[in-house]
């Protein structure tokens, strides 16, 4: 499978994404960053149930709360803009991973986001190793992708 298929996505700015000035409402960038890595794992072939446990499950599963997030707006993102979304996941430690997301319009960087997740046991809330399938996605995303993070 070509990493570009799960690391480079498209997003169109919709009316509901914008404020009264016609530019993206600030919180949507982080939502898009998170939705993009969710879409990426889906394209890669990982079931959402593996990454995001069901509240109905009684198994020992990991949860992945966000422990840090940032968004930088470099140029206005407007209604109707078609954006290319590039995802750069990386493992920070056995229990932490980061997903950097670049948003480009016509190959010009217009925004960037960063989200850091911590892997915790759902019951004890103690730090635990990242799920194996998530680690494989991170590893595969960093092998010969030729994607350059700006």
Swiss-Prot record:
Catalytic activity: 1,4-dihydroxy-2-naphthoyl-CoA + H2O = 1,4-dihydroxy-2-naphthoate + CoA + H(+)
Membrane spanning residue stretches: none
GO terms (BP aspect): phylloquinone biosynthetic process
Entry EC no(s): 3.1.2.28
Keywords tagged on the record: Hydrolase
Pathway linked to the protein: Cofactor biosynthesis; phylloquinone biosynthesis; Quinol/quinone metabolism; 1,4-dihydroxy-2-naphthoate biosynthesis; 1,4-dihydroxy-2-naphthoate from chorismate: step 7/7
Keyword set includes Hydrolase: yes
Coiled-coil region list: none
Active site per UniProt: 19
Domain of life: Bacteria
InterPro entries in UniProt: DHNA_CoA_hydrolase (IPR022829), HotDog_dom_sf (IPR029069)
A Pfam family of this chain: 4HBT_2
GO molecular function: 1,4-dihydroxy-2-naphthoyl-CoA thioesterase activity
Family: Belongs to the 4-hydroxybenzoyl-CoA thioesterase family. DHNA-CoA hydrolase subfamily.
Summary of the function given for this chain in its UniProt record: Catalyzes the hydrolysis of 1,4-dihydroxy-2-naphthoyl-CoA (DHNA-CoA) to 1,4-dihydroxy-2-naphthoate (DHNA), a reaction involved in phylloquinone (vitamin K1) biosynthesis.
Protein name as catalogued: 1,4-dihydroxy-2-naphthoyl-CoA hydrolase
């Amino acid at each position: 499978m070509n990493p570009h298929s799960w690391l480079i996505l498209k997003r169109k700015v919709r009316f509901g994404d914008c404020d009264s000035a016609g530019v993206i409402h600030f919180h949507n960038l982080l939502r898009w960053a998170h939705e993009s890595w969710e879409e990426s794992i889906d394209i890669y072939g990982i079931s959402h149930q593996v990454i995001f446990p069901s509240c109905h499950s009684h198994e020992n599963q990991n949860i992945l709360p966000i422990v840090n997030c940032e968004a930088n707006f470099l140029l206005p993102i407007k209604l109707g803009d078609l954006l290319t979304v590039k995802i750069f996941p990386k493992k920070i430690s056995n229990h932490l991973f980061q997903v950097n997301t670049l948003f480009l319009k016509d190959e010009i960087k217009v925004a960037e986001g960063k989200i850091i997740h911590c892997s915790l046991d759902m019951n004890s809330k103690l730090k635990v190793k990242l799920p194996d399938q998530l680690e494989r996605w991170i590893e595969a995303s960093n092998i010969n992708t030729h994607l350059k993070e700006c």
